[in-house]
A protein has these predicted regions:
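An N-terminal hydrophobic leader/cap segment in hydrolases
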Residues: 36-78
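Alpha/beta-hydrolase fold nucleophile elbow
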Residues: 165-176
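Catalytic histidine-centered segment of alpha/beta-hydrolase-like enzymes
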Residues: 277-287
């Protein structure tokens, strides 16, 4: 009788164990899917908070100057099989032999809000190709990411190279987060054969470092940052002359982070620290020092 009981009991126990294992695996899969969903949600929220892109054209904008060009190009979309629109401006200098600068802006403000700084760069002697990453201005309205911004900068650089065939007259410029984009771009190219110089204004070491500088809550957020822009880890690969400008009254990116980035770069990096300079208006906070630094760089390009 005992043997008969065990004969039926043992297979039942084994089946129960197999069922538990299957249930455990299913539970792990469901937990993993839930975690991935939470991570995806967190990543989306991070990107919305970090970039805060400004779409559209501001009220009251009357257009670019005569001779300046606003145009769009098509790029692979975020969703497979789709196409997105990438808006660029071509703002040539009166001197046809002027060096050409790729303008990479930071968070929040689109190109329309960057016009005063762009005008200051043209005043110094640059032709300017400026790009609104997808999510900003008249480019396709997406929630941008570090990857999409890098991709957009690559497309803009190809356009600049088409318009300016001489590498010795090509310059990369990045303001704030745009500096992180500029460092990424420059770190994958070579001085002389690809471009001539890199200009960074109000730029940071990395986004997690900016968050940490805001206090303990920012330090906690930095632990979960999906958007890095790790310029400090890349800038040593930049072999071209570098000009860095930063205001000592910058309330967005502390000047200490700019100094740390300078220290991670090549030893002959030129550092211009503007007394009382803010985050976004160095061109108007100290116009003489700003213009002098840019014109000296242009003179060195030959």
């Amino acid at each position: 009788m005992v043997r008969i009981v065990f004969k039926f009991l043992i297979p039942s126990v084994r089946a129960g164990r197999r069922g538990l294992r299957r249930a455990s695996k299913l539970g792990l899969i469901l937990a993993a899917l839930a975690a991935l969903s939470a991570c995806a949600w967190l990543d989306t929220k991070q990107r919305q908070l970090v970039y805060r892109p400004t779409p559209g054209v501001p009220a009251g904008f009357t257009g670019l100057r005569v001779g300046d060009l606003s145009f769009a190009t098509q790029v692979p979309g975020v969703e497979p099989g789709t196409r997105d629109s990438l808006q660029m401006w071509w703002l040539p200098h009166a001197n046809s032999r002027a060096p050409t600068l790729l303008y990479l802006h930071g968070t929040f403000r689109n190109l329309y809000r960057n016009l005063p700084k762009i005008d200051a760069l043209r005043e110094a002697g640059f032709s300017v190709l400026a790009v609104d990453y997808r999510g900003w201005g008249e480019s396709s309205p997406i929630i941008p990411s570090e990857a999409t911004i890098y991709a957009d900068a690559n497309v803009a650089w190809a356009e600049l190279a088409r318009r300016q065939p001489e590498p010795r007259l090509r310059v990369i410029f990045g303001h704030s987060l745009g500096g992180g984009v500029a460092v990424e771009l420059a770190s994958r190219m070579r001085h002389g054969s690809d471009y001539a110089a890199l200009i960074l204004e109000s730029t940071f070491t990395s986004l997690p470092d900016v968050a940490s500088a805001a206090g303990w809550l920012g330090s906690l957020g930095a632990l979960f940052a999906s958007q890095k822009f790790d310029s400090a880890g890349k800038i040593a690969k930049v072999d071209a002359p570098i000009l860095m400008l930063h205001g000592d009254a910058d309330q967005t990116v502390p000047v200490a982070l700019g100094r740390q980035l300078r220290d991670a770069a090549r030893k002959d990096t030129r550092w211009v620290e503007i007394s009382g300079g803010s985050h976004s208006r160095l061109h108007s906070d100290a116009p003489e020092a700003y213009q002098q630094a840019l014109k000296l760089l242009i003179a060195q390009l030959g």
